[in-house]
Structures are given as structure tokens and as C-alpha cells.
Amino acid sequence: MRALLLIISFCLVAVLQAQDSSFLAFNNGNFSGKWFLKALVSEDDIPINKVSPMLILVLNNGDIELSITHMIYDQCLEVTTILEKTDVPGQYLAFEGKTHLQVQLSSVKGHYMLYCDGEIEGMRFLMTQLIGRDPQENLEALEEFKVFTQIKGLVAENLVILEQMEKCEPESFYELPSRPSE
């Protein structure tokens, strides 16, 4: 379970940097702040039903700090992590190079699509995610995301639309310790 949550959190971070015409031009002012995970598709069933807004901070060295809280089985799980940039614009590596993250700019303003694949704690995964600056559902962005998902080899029928929550208030709360990149 912890590995799955880390996968989701690391994939979210991938949205934050890209520099050529096929990706989003990076600008610290555009990315630090609040983002919303609107939808995701994975090969495996994801037990997340609610998410808080992501708080993102682009660090001076280009690395990114991300904090998000997921509601899983009526419990809150807070994840804060640092993701290191690579030499390839819009791509990141995590978990000692075993996890690859890629950003795709959506044609819908304020939306980005993420493709994540790799291995975390022995668990292989493949996932796409749709994030945006506001919590409202955008059907145009969602339709584009479904096409993106199919191009990346996933089945759009596995789409999960996530419920947004401002603050997690479950019966219990669990915080994962920060896990620095190496």
C-alpha cells in the first residue's frame, strides 16, 4: 500500500518541469502553489477515493517538493517528497532510477497529463494522471486525457475521477516519513 501511494505521489511531481515544444516551458512562478489531481488510470485497482490539493514548491536547484494527502480506506495518508530533475526536459527519475516520469501539456489551459512507469519496492506499475489548477471537472481535459491514456497503453475504462477535499478528516491519520532522493 505504501509503495502504491508513493508511486502516485511521485507521478504527480512530474508535471512540474519541461522545456521544449512537446512539453510545458518551465516557470517557477507557474508551478509553485496549489494543484489538483483530477483523474488517474492504472493497470491495478487504486483504493484512493479522495485527495487534498497538492502543495508544490520548486526549489532553487530545480528539484521539486510535493505534499499531498490521500484518503484511503477512510484513513488519511500524507506524503511529502522531493523529486530530482534529470537532464531531459520534462522527465524525472525516482527510486534510484527505477521510476520514470514524463509530463505532457494538455491543450486545455491549466491542465497537464502525466505518464509514470517503473518499479517501487518490487512492485511494477504503469499510470497516467490528469492534474489542473482548479478542482472543477473539465470535460474537454478529461476527453483528451482518455486519448492520452490509450496512447500510453492503458485502458480508459480503469479511469478514476477523484473527489477533492480541502482537509482530510478521517477516523485515523498516518504520515509517511519523508524519503529523500538519492
UniProtKB/Swiss-Prot annotation:
Lineage, highest ranks first: Eukaryota, Metazoa, Chordata, Craniata, Vertebrata
Record SUPFAM superfamilies: Lipocalins (SSF50814)
Gene Ontology molecular function: any one: pheromone binding
Domain of life: Eukaryota
Positions of disulphide bridges: C76-C168
Record key words, sorted: Disulfide bond, Glycoprotein, Pheromone-binding, Secreted, Signal, Transport
Sites carrying sugar chains: N30
Protein name: Vomeronasal secretory protein 1
Leader peptide range in chain numbering: 1-18
Pfam families given in the database record: Lipocalin
Gene responsible for this protein: Lcn3
Tissue expression notes: Specifically expressed in vomeronasal and posterior glands of the nasal septum, the ducts of which open into the lumen of the vomeronasal organ.
